[in-house]
């Protein structure tokens, strides 16, 4: 089951998955709207009876300096990256608690750990750092219900944004990556699949860096 603010985007992804032989469904919802989130979760539970895995992948960014940033800019970034994540996680956790089982994986970022350096401004980095703290605290609250909550922190990934970068800027970013290349989306997906599996049953409150060595801690 996938969710997007745009139904056409959902439908396109669902069709792509169906061609691969995957049973899929897509729902349009604004994750920053509490009522829309509740309705979404209710629809999914009505149809499938349970929710085993939640992957929080919704996010937005903006390249702007602190000097040029506005309070509205900060609110907009946090509204999706943190507040929307909170709303869907809160709603899904109630379902998972009743099941005594759940896997939650949040998409944070290397920017949330080292403070920018790839895309986005300080407000983006701050929102992704907030996700890390939220996940750790949540782990202490829900572990007793058989629910794990972890983060993945991608660095530079081979997406359309990366491909659109000017060569000079791209070369400068690559120079800071020991592996000398951007990551692939499949490499991020592999980590998410592991954290969402039963094999990761004793891992919670953790963060996995996927950045080719550009940040190590």
Regions found by a protein language model. Give the residues of each.
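Active-site helix of classical SDR
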Residues: 89, 127, 135
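Alpha-helical segment proximal to the catalytic Tyr-Lys
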Residues: 94, 136, 140-141, 201
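Conserved glycine-rich Rossmann-like NAD(P)H-binding loop of the short-chain dehydrogenase/reductase
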Residues: 1-12
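Substrate-binding pocket helix/loop in short-chain dehydrogenase/reductase
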Residues: 65-66, 73-78, 162, 173
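C-terminal helical subdomain
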Residues: 144, 151, 172-203, 210-212
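The beta1-alpha1 cofactor-binding region of Rossmann-like NAD(H)/NADP(H)-dependent oxidoreductases
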Residues: 7-8, 28-39, 71, 186-187
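Residue(s) in the substrate-gating loop at a strand-loop-helix junction
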Residues: 109
């Amino acid at each position: 089951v996938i969710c997007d603010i745009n139904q056409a985007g959902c439908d396109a992804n669902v069709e792509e998955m169906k061609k691969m032989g995957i049973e899929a469904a897509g729902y349009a919802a604004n994750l920053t709207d509490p009522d829309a989130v509740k309705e979404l979760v209710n629809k999914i539970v009505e149809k499938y009876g349970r929710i085993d895995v939640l992957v929080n992948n919704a996010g937005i960014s903006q390249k702007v300096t602190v000097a040029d940033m506005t309070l509205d800019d900060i609110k907009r970034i946090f509204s999706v990256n943190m507040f929307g994540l909170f709303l869907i996680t809160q709603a899904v956790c109630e379902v998972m608690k009743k099941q005594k089982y759940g896997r939650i994986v949040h998409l944070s970022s290397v920017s949330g750990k080292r403070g920018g350096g790839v895309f986005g401004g300080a407000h983006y980095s701050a929102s992704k750092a907030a996700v890390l703290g939220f996940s750790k605290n949540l782990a202490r609250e829900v572990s007793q219900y058989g629910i794990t909550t972890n983060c993945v922190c991608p660095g530079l990934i081979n997406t359309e944004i990366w491909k659109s970068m000017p060569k000079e800027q791209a070369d400068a970013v690559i120079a800071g990556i020991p592996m000398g290349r951007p990551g692939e989306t499949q490499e991020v997906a592999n980590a998410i699949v592991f954290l969402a599996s039963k094999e990761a049953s004793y891992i919670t409150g953790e963060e996995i860096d996927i950045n080719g060595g550009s940040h190590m801690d």
